[in-house]
Amino acid sequence: MNLQRFPRYPLTFGPTPIQPLKRLSAHLGGKVELYAKREDCNSGLAFGGNKTRKLEYLVPDALAQGADTLVSIGGVQSNQTRQVAAVAAHLGMKCVLVQEHWVNYEDPVYDRVGNIQLSRMMGADVRLVSDGFDIGIRRSWEEAMESVRQAGGKPYPIPAGCSEHPLGGLGFVGFAEEVRAQEAQLGFKFDYVVVCSVTGSTQAGMVVGFAADGRADRVIGIDASAKPEQTREQITRIARHTAELVELGRDIVEQDVVLDTRYGGPEYGLPSDGTLEAIRLCARLEGMLTDPVYEGKSMHGMIDKVRLGEFEPGSKVLYAHLGGAPALSAYNGIFRNG
C-alpha cells in the first residue's frame, strides 16, 4: 500500500490520542473494553474533526490548481462546512458554503448558532438553500461554483463530506496506518472499530486501510443517514476507488463493507430516544460529548451492540469519535435540562 505518494498539507496536531473509556465499559458489564480515538481533538482549526484529516489531502491539490476559493456544501449545522471555512481562513483563501435544509428540526436559533455561526465568524460566504437532504452531488453547489467563476474567482470543489472528491478517502487510510502504529505501542490490536457513516468516505478510507492487515470487515459502520442503501453503495464505490489509488493490491468486495442500519432513525439529523440516552450516558460517565446527528448515533450503536452481546467477551473496541459537538447548541431545546 502506498499512501505516501500523495502530498499531505498538515492541518492536524499529529496522531490523535486513544482514550480508554473505563467507566462506560464498566457500566456496560466490563466484558468488552471500549476505547475512543479522538478525531474531535485533532486540530486547532475551529475544533477540527474528521473532515480536517481528509482536507489534508485535498489542500495540496487546491493549491496546485491555483484555486482562490474553497466551495463546499452541507446541512445548516454541517461540521464539514465549518472545517472547510477554518481551512480557508488558515490558508488565506475565500470560502463559499452552501447550507441546505437537511434536517427537519425547527428551532428559532438553529441557523444562528453552532457550526454555521462559527463559519460566519471565520468569514465564509454562507448561502442558505431550502433543498432537502441528499448525499450526492447537488445543483446548488454547482451553481455556487459557477457564481465564483462569474465573479472572476477560481473555485475548488469540495463535495459533502469530501466524499465524492477523488482524494476523499485518503485521510482515513492514514487513520488506519496511525492506529496500527499506536497498537504497536499499546501491545494489542483492536478487534473492532466503530464509526459513523453518512456520505461514506470516512468508513471507505478505514476499510481500505484496515484491509492491508486483513481487518476490513472489522470496521463497523453505523449508518446515520437513514438512507442506508445509498450510503452503502457510496462507501463501497469510494473504497474501491481509494484502494486503486493507494495500490492496496486486492479488490474491495461487498463483504468488506459492514454497515449496521438499526440506528439511523427516525431520519437524518433527528435523534431517537436511544441516541439521546447514549449522548447523556457518555457525557455523564466519561465527560465526552457526542451530538444528535452523527456521533450520538454511532455511540448508541456501539452501546447497544455491547448490551446485545454482539462483541465477543474480551473484545477491544475502538470508537472513532469524528467530532460534531459544536452543533449541540443548535439542539438546545432537546438538551435544555441536560
Curated annotation (Swiss-Prot):
Enumerate the InterPro entries for this protein: ACCD_DCysDesulf (IPR027278), ACP_carboxylate_deaminase (IPR005965), ACP_carboxylate_deaminase_bac (IPR020601), TrpB-like_PALP (IPR001926), TrpB-like_PALP_sf (IPR036052)
The protein's role, per its UniProt record: Catalyzes a cyclopropane ring-opening reaction, the irreversible conversion of 1-aminocyclopropane-1-carboxylate (ACC) to ammonia and alpha-ketobutyrate. Allows growth on ACC as a nitrogen source.
Keywords linked to the UniProt accession: Hydrolase, Pyridoxal phosphate
The catalytic activity of this protein is classed by the Enzyme Commission as: 3.5.99.7
Matching entries from NCBIfam families are given as:
ACC_deam
Respond yes or no to whether keyword Magnesium is given for this record. no
Cofactors (names)? pyridoxal 5'-phosphate
Q: Provide the catalytic activity annotation.
A: 1-aminocyclopropane-1-carboxylate + H2O = 2-oxobutanoate + NH4(+)
PTM-bearing positions, type N6-(pyridoxal phosphate)lysine: 51
Subunit-structure text: Homotrimer.
Determine if Thylakoid is one of this entry's keywords.
Answer: no
Q: Which GO terms describe its biological process?
A: 1-aminocyclopropane-1-carboxylate metabolic process; amine catabolic process
GN (gene name): acdS
- Which CDD domains does this one have? ACCD
What name does UniProt use for this protein? 1-aminocyclopropane-1-carboxylate deaminase
Q: What organism is listed for this UniProt entry?
A: Burkholderia orbicola (strain MC0-3)
Q: Which family does it belong to?
A: Belongs to the ACC deaminase/D-cysteine desulfhydrase family.
